[in-house]
């Protein structure tokens, strides 16, 4: 989240390079995007180190249970239009990120969707 980015930058200091990752789902249907996000995050939700980090960011156990609350999924996987997604990426830069790596979230096996997402947000 951009909040985590700001916390990391405050620890590293202004001169250090900070690369962060943001899961991106180029999908305007929130229910579809959340379903894809839940599938993507499922493996992380059982890992204690991830849960501790998310709890330290203000999420609750309830946010992390049962596949993740909508609030949690929306925070971890930005979705919507290109403009909506770009705003979240910009929030990371505003919070001190030097680089934001996007991780496409898409239907399993749909590499064309991943390529469309990467191309849409590629620099230059």
Language-model region placement:
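Active-site-adjacent structural elements that line small-molecule/cofactor binding pockets in enzymes
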Residues: 1-124
């Amino acid at each position: 989240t951009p909040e985590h980015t700001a916390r990391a930058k405050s620890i590293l200091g202004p001169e250090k390079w900070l690369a962060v990752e943001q899961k991106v789902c180029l999908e305007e249907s929130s229910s579809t995007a959340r379903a894809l996000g839940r599938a993507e995050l499922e493996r992380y939700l059982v890992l204690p180190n991830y849960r501790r980090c998310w709890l330290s960011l203000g999420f609750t156990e309830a946010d992390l249970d049962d596949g993740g609350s909508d609030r949690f999924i929306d925070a971890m996987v930005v979705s919507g239009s290109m403009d909506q997604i770009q705003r979240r990426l910009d929030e990371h830069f505003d919070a001190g990120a030097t680089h934001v790596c996007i991780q496409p979230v898409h239907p399993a096996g749909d590499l064309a969707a991943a390529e469309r997402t990467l191309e849409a947000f590629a620099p230059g």
